[in-house]
A protein has these predicted regions:
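Conserved beta-hairpin
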Residues: 41-56
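Conserved acetyl-CoA pyrophosphate-binding loop and the N-cap/start of the following alpha-helix
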Residues: 77, 81-89
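Short amphipathic alpha-helix that is part of the acyltransferase structural core
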Residues: 1-30, 142
């Protein structure tokens, strides 16, 4: 893994679909994958000889609201510091892009909160914000 590079570039729809499958996330079609990739504010990848090993994406309005939507490393490579490399790039992007008072949000999988805490994130139940909420299944559209 000596040739692993961090590259600020979009991923392909096929890569997005493949990594969702690796994570056990619900399947999305190619059109949906293309749209979500195109709408990202920022994407950073880990690649070795052109092969995707992981990626992170940020979505939002690019000024005041930023949501870290994915920080995904191939399961075989977890624990090797690759997620940290991705997040370091995300944090640098946010420093360049976010205005004073911006809201930067991440919704980690249960048990992964400490990963984000090392980058300064706090759990929402700190008294200022509620615990955070989501719409299960997102069945607003087929």
């Amino acid at each position: 893994m000596a040739n692993v590079v961090v590259v600020e570039e979009a991923i392909t729809a096929a890569e997005f679909i493949e990594f969702r499958k690796l994570m056990g996330s619900p399947h999305v079609d190619s059109e949906t994958a293309r749209k979500t990739i195109a709408n990202a504010l920022y994407t950073v990848c880990l690649r070795e000889d052109g092969h995707l090993l992981g990626f992170a994406r940020v979505v939002g309005d690019g000024v005041l609201y930023f949501y870290i939507s994915d920080v995904i490393v191939h399961p075989a490579l977890r624990g090797g510091g690759y997620g940290i490399r991705l997040m370091n790039s995300v944090v640098e992007y946010l420093k360049r892009s976010a205005r004073a008072g911006a809201m930067v949000v991440v919704v980690p999988l249960a048990g992964r909160e400490s990963f984000y805490e090392r980058f300064g994130f706090r759990q929402c139940s700190d008294g200022r914000f509620g615990a955070g909420m989501y719409l299960p299944g997102c069945t607003l559209r087929p």
